[in-house]
Regions:
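A structural micro-motif
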Residues: 1, 40-41, 65, 93
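Rossmann-fold NAD(P)-binding glycine/threonine-rich loop
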Residues: 3-59
Length: 132
C-alpha cells in the first residue's frame, strides 16, 4: 500500500503556486503514481493539510475537521482510515472518502487555494470542515 501525500505544485512563478499543467483537471499525480505502481494500492490522503496536522489532528478545532481520501481499493482506504484514527487522532467520521483515485484531481486542485489561505491567515494550522 502507498499513501500518497504529494501535490504537483509549480513554484516557478513564485507564490502562490499553480498546479503543473499536466496534472490539472484531467489527470493527477495520484493517478500517475497508481499507473506506475500498478500492483500497489494507492491511497491519496493528507495532501490538503500542513505536516504538523497530518500527524496530530487535535491541533486544530479539537480534531473536528475533515480529511479527504481517495483510492481504488476499499480495503486499503479502510486501513488508512484506521491508521490515521489509531495513531494521529483523526476521527473516523471526519475522514471523507471521495471515491476512486481520479478524485485526487480534486484534492490536488484545492492546494493552491490552501496556500493562498495560509498566506492570508499567516498560519498553516487550519483545515476544512464540511458542514451538513
Amino acid at each position: 500500500m502507498v499513501i500518497d501525500v504529494t501535490n504537483p505544485l509549480d513554484f516557478s512563478n513564485g507564490m502562490p503556486p499553480s498546479l503543473l499543467p499536466e496534472y490539472s483537471n484531467t489527470w493527477s499525480l495520484g493517478e500517475e503514481i497508481q499507473k506506475h505502481l500498478a500492483d500497489a494500492k494507492v491511497v491519496k490522503a493528507l495532501n490538503t493539510i500542513t505536516a504538523k496536522l497530518m500527524v496530530d489532528a487535535t491541533l486544530v478545532n479539537d480534531a473536528n475537521h475533515n480529511l479527504f481520501i481517495c483510492g481504488n481499493d476499499g480495503d486499503a482506504k479502510n486501513t488508512v482510515k484506521q491508521l490515521l484514527a489509531d495513531n494521529f487522532s483523526w476521527k473516523a467520521e471526519n475522514i471523507l472518502d471521495l471515491g476512486d483515485i481520479k478524485y485526487a484531481r480534486m484534492t490536488e486542485g484545492i492546494v493552491p487555494f490552501w496556500v493562498s489561505v495560509m498566506q492570508q491567515q499567516g498560519t498553516a494550522m487550519f483545515n476544512y470542515l464540511v458542514v451538513r
